[in-house]
Amino acid sequence: MCQRFGIDVSHWQGDFNFANAKNNEGVEFAIIKAGGGDDGLYKDSRFEDNYRKCVECGLPKGAYFYGNAKSVADAKKEAEYFISILSGKKYEYPVFYDVEGKMITDNDRATLTEIVKAFCEIMESAGYWVGIYSSESFFNSEMNDGELTRYSHWVARWGKSKPT
């Protein structure tokens, strides 16, 4: 398997220097936080600037949305909102549904799987290359991952100093 070195960036990183990351740190792509649903529906305050900086330095990019859906109806609202943020922009990497936190604790396995599928189906029908971000243990124990294999997987391995 070919490994590439990428980063995820949100407002938490502040005024991030993508050109330096690409030219001096070996970063090959960035996945930018577009928004989330964990505090009402919102757009990440740095999204537009982060997107622009990636374009300016030629860094390939994708985007992600931090989910908080408690039902299929919520997931559909989150997907439509995500589409509104992404509209008019180009992505070389998938757009991801970030599945962690309260989505895991507030939903049973079958419900969470249906929520994730609903979100991804809407994104895919809008023409996006869609993926799911979660930890390996969440993919294995909190979702019916066999029903989600058609979507790209970005597997979190928190606490590692280097990708494995």
What is the meaning of each model-derived region?
Residues C57-A73, K89-D106:
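Metal-dependent polysaccharide deacetylase catalytic core of the NodB/CE4 family, i.e.
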Residues M1-G35:
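Boundary/entry segment of secreted carbohydrate-active catalytic domains
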Residues I7, A21-K22, C54, Y97, ...:
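Conserved, mostly hydrophobic/aromatic
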Residues F5-V9, E28-I32, K61-F65, V95-Y97, ...:
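Hydrophobic faces of well-ordered beta-strands that scaffold small-molecule active sites
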Residues K43-R46, A69-I83:
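Glycine-rich anion/phosphate-binding loops
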Residues F16-G26, R46-L59, F82-Y91:
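Acidic (Asp/Glu)-rich catalytic clusters
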Residues H11-D15, G35-L41, G67-V72, G101-I104, ...:
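Solvent-exposed loop/turn segments at secondary-structure junctions
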Residues N24-V27, E80-V95, K102-T164:
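Surface-exposed substrate-engagement region within the catalytic domains
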